Amino acid sequence: MNTIKRSLCLAVCATALLAACTKKADKPAVLVPLVNRIDIKTIWSTKVGGERPILRLGLGVAVDGQSVFAASYKGEVLAYQLGTGKLLWQHKLRAPLSAGPAAGDGLLILGSSKGDVIAWSQKDGSPRWRVRINSEILSPAAIGNGLVVVRGVDGKLHGLSAQDGSENWVVDQQVPRLSLRGTSRPTVVGDLALCGFDNGRVLAVTTVTGTTAWDAAVGQSHGSSELQRLIDVDATVVSDGDDLFAVAYQGRVARLTRETGQIIWARDLSSFRGLAVDGNGVYVATAEGDVVRLDRRTGAEQWRLKTLERRQLSAPVVYRGRVVVADLGGIVHWLDAASGAELARHSVGKHRINTPMVVAGDLLLVFGDDGQLSALRAPEFEATTGG
């Protein structure tokens, strides 16, 4: 049944993406020439394993302190010095890795396509514990409050002890028969664990007992076919202050209160990539490849960039006062946060950048589907004031 489920998910993902890409044209938008208005430098770059399969695997980059951690689907796990890219240690697992790493509390957590949750020491990569949740893992874990919180593709959210991996609690959400291939990454905020699910809901549970604190419907099902009714919340729920922000495929982007899950505002917008926020705006990479800024307070659309349509954008990040997205050709795009104007491009390879970029101090870490890991630096944004 698991194999059938995975095949259906992959087929649905391909069909849904194809539908999104063929609304206006079959090919990605052609980039028009651009003279860079800011100076972007590659500080260091390295290769992590070989090219990954063309699947939405949850492999990415994790940072804790001055260390950077990365992994390949073939089981390679590596640690680097953040500032220089110097290799600190590396190990090889005999397991097909599909999610992680996640870093926190001295631990490094990885997930496998067979449902293994594997804990390592950040210091030297020595093994700590290993358990199996009997479900494929497609998103990195969350670490906090003495827990490792893991989401499986079967709709279960597991709260594992960070000490030995024993299960403290498990929460089960009903999973639709068909869904996009991918799962929302859980997050731990205060005494709550937050996660989105394939049924369009965002769930908050207490980290102590796993009791549901609240759940909110971000996706709303419409249409007559199962494809039209896909409403997965695959993007990570973003926490900022007392606010939460979530977005669903073929659904809505919403601002919620962290304490109760009450929806403050919601706007129709489709995304499975994700969003970023700052003090004024909410930035979303849509399923069609637009980049949209919404007013943080009201949800009103403030600008929309359409020149990157069908370029399979990554989730946006806010880095040094600007909005950054990456695309299918290994190109990283810098946008003006206030206007959406394109400021600069920087190539880090020729392969898609599917995994979320990571802001680490004054560096931006970019991990391509071919395993190329790059640390970039751009100058801080300086606002001008009228005289």
Question: Whereabouts are the PLM-identified features?
Answer:
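Short loop/turn segments that connect beta-strands within beta-propeller blades
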Residues: Q81-T84, S121-D124, S161-D164, T207-G210, ...
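Loop/turn-rich, solvent-exposed surfaces of beta-rich toroidal or solenoidal domains
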Residues: Y283-R293, A300-W334
